[in-house]
Regions:
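Residues forming the flavin
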Residues: 3-50, 55-323
């Protein structure tokens, strides 16, 4: 197969025909065409179309073009000997879930701790709060399986150009996310699919020998000689000392008791810059019309988004996100 870039594809266009036109070959010579990346070109509101990269198989003449190198997952180093003590991961948001999955694949049998509930029970806890204003301090919008973004639309953009990010997308698809995140220029899972993908990641961790404990809160860290010896856990009314020599803290930004504990135990903490802002809401049809003009209602496009940013002379700035 060959890789073909910068293919112009009409919103209702046929991918094979578009590839043939780009390559200047008969349509019948295009045996197969698969999307690798697709973005919307809306610079001209009277000519909104897709720009596509595709993997193409030709009947003849592939040697004239750049070959397609398919993505291959990174090699997993499986431990030859299991560690004497199982690694502990604190927090079942994105960082914790993927840390636990990576350790599980390596044969380390990690223990993943989450102070909140599993995502289905958490949805019920959040809905109860909306209806009654009865707050469950351990299972809510901030705490629980999936992290603080579990009920968002699951945008997957990152400014980090790390090849391992591709593995994350493939893992999410395996966990139940839609296949199109593999080729969308701005991939997102969708609010309706994200909780199921989170459950799927948990099941993958369990299938590889990991353990997941919900409603289990890390309350203390025992150190000796500058090394970790155990973690103390609270589950319901029970307290447990779990012997451990490795701990990954993926607690997010709201577990303030944990940060206070770390400071008390002498851990080095560093301030992180944060942004303050306001929530802006627009009718979706207004944004889609502004971005896509007369094509706004086309079913191939879906909801439009936008991003605005300004950098001020004093070094500060204003920007939009998740729009």
């Amino acid at each position: 197969m060959i890789e073909v870039r910068d293919i112009r594809l009409a919103l209702d266009g046929d991918l094979k025909a578009a590839c043939a036109k780009k390559l200047r070959v008969p349509v019948g010579d295009v045996l197969e065409a698969a999307l690798l990346r697709r973005s919307v070109d809306a610079r001209r509101k009277d000519d909104v179309h897709f720009t596509v990269t595709a993997a193409v198989s030709l009947r003849r003449g592939e040697e004239k073009f750049s070959p397609y190198t398919p993505w291959t997952p990174p090699r997993v180093e499986v431990l030859k000997k299991k560690p004497a003590l199982r690694p502990v991961v604190c927090g079942a948001g994105p960082a914790g879930l993927f840390a636990a999955l990576t350790l599980a694949r390596a044969g380390a049998e990690p223990i993943l701790l989450e102070r909140g509930s599993a995502v289905d029970e958490r949805k019920a806890d959040v809905e109860k709060f909306y209806q009654t204003r009865a707050l469950d301090t351990e299972s809510n919008i901030q705490f629980g399986e999936g992290g603080a973004g579990a009920f968002s639309d699951g945008k997957l953009n990152t400014g980090t150009h790390d090849k391992r990010g591709r593995q994350v997308l493939h893992d999410l698809v395996q966990a139940g996310a839609p296949d199109e995140i593999l080729w969308q220029a701005k991939p997102h899972i969708g609010t309706d699919r994200l909780p199921d993908a989170v459950k799927g990641l948990r099941e993958m961790i369990l299938a590889h020998g990991g353990e997941v404990r919900f409603r289990t809160k890390l309350t203390d860290i025992e150190l000796s000689g500058g090394a970790l010896r155990a973690v103390r856990l609270a589950h319901g009314g029970a307290v447990e000392a779990l012997e451990a020599d490795s701990l990954i803290l993926a607690a997010g930004h709201s577990a303030r008791e944990l940060f206070a504990l770390l400071k008390e135990r002498g851990a080095q903490l560093e301030q992180k810059a944060f942004s303050m802002g306001v929530r802006c809401e627009h009718p979706q049809e207004v944004i889609s019309r502004a971005q896509y003009g007369a094509f706004a209602a086309h079913p191939a496009l879906g909801a439009a988004d936008y991003r605005l940013a300004v950098h001020l002379p004093d070094g500060r700035g204003v920007y939009t996100f998740c729009m």
